[in-house]
Amino acid sequence: MSDENVLADLAKAVIVTMHQIPQLEQLPVHELQKIPLGRLRRDATRLHAVCRYQKGVKKSEIVGPNDVRCVDVHPVALTDDWQRYAAFLLYHEFLHALGFTGHDRTFRNLEALWPDIEARNMGKSFGNHLRRRAAKCLWTCPQCSKEHPRTRRGMGRYRCRECRVVLLDVKVGP
């Protein structure tokens, strides 16, 4: 199945789940299906998903889904291993689309209502996965064997935080 189909199916499932959350009853959840969905660049390592607003709309003036230009999700999140996390990402971005622009207490309380607890906690491992995928070398501590994936070589300029030993550059892949 193509990424577009996976994304559309996930969005439908997320909207159905959002309709079942009582705290979201008063919000225009049905309008979320009108928001165009897209993908981030494959080489993005820090951004997992984003809610992009219409040009000229200030974050403080956002009222609902009509102010949203599109929601983009990282294409790696649409693979089988990460689809549960992709569903949570869509939920997170749809909350932004409903007018909760910041990550304040209200937003975090609504975000915590997502039923898949494990998916809510997959962000750190997904970020590590993206960084490891993009890494050209690993800065490795010869003493404690801790690895730090990087795109540039360290050239002996960096030390391990715990051991204070100079990190070695280990080339990754072919």
Residue ranges and their predicted role:
Residues 1-88, 97-174:
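Active-site-proximal or metal-binding-adjacent scaffold patches in catalytic folds
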